[in-house]
């Protein structure tokens, strides 16, 4: 089956209305994009979690609607414009989208990723690249974190170089469970992953089972407030600052804290947020991101 893609450039305040109208009139899918993407005028829109976006669409928004080959996009666009009280009907672009083996196409875009000296993240449709590699079998999909982002790589490299056998580990904001899983594969003891997203918890459990690793994954309210030898959190700077007291309390006396998801320019303010409990320094940076680490001293 072939498809038709219809692209309409609209004003920022019309993007949501156009999306709703096209979908109601039979579009198979509708998305809104920045019309200036990949140009000097590209407009960042969404910030970190905990910070409300200043606006909900780009100044020059592009509405992209997908139709089946039996649909008449011209009729649909005209009907949507009439429904919205817009006259004349705006210009739009049409292009044919040929049906493909979408699974094979998607798989071809993901190759094994080497992290550090021995760690490899390998999709299920690939073989392990080295016989003595520490292999994480992980497919892109249900939740976040396949090892491709610098912050994930930094945390995994830290674990490879610094984790001590038998240490207990808390992975806060576990996403796909990748850090908890690699910690267990590197010799960690009891390991717990926490995430506020039930889908992430589900994905982490699935990935741990697939990798033949024993680790616990749960929502925050389901986990006791125990302390750990190592706490790792790869989130973003604003949530990390808000959770400074809580995350620090999860680190036992003499234990270590590892944070990432922090830009180089944000490192000092994140370290300052944790200063009442433990000192944090930059362990390593990559592509503008940093990994912070520190040891909690003996508690009074």
From Swiss-Prot:
EC assignment: 2.1.1.-
Substrates-to-products reaction catalysed: L-lysyl-[protein] + 3 S-adenosyl-L-methionine = N(6),N(6),N(6)-trimethyl-L-lysyl-[protein] + 3 S-adenosyl-L-homocysteine + 3 H(+)
GO terms for biological process, alphabetical: methylation
Main location: cytoplasm
Database matches in CDD domains: AdoMet_MTases
Molecular-function annotations in GO: protein-lysine N-methyltransferase activity
Assigned keywords, A-Z: Cytoplasm, Methyltransferase, S-adenosyl-L-methionine, Transferase
Amino-acid positions noted as binding S-adenosyl-L-methionine in the UniProt annotation, renumbered to this chain: 152, 173, 195, 234
Entry GO terms, CC: cytosol
Subcellular localization, as worded in the UniProt entry: Cytoplasm
Xref: Gene3D superfamilies: Vaccinia Virus protein VP39
PANTHER family, alphabetized: ELECTRON TRANSFER FLAVOPROTEIN BETA SUBUNIT LYSINE METHYLTRANSFERASE
Role this protein plays: Methylates ribosomal protein L11.
Family note: Belongs to the methyltransferase superfamily. PrmA family.
Name of the protein in question: Ribosomal protein L11 methyltransferase
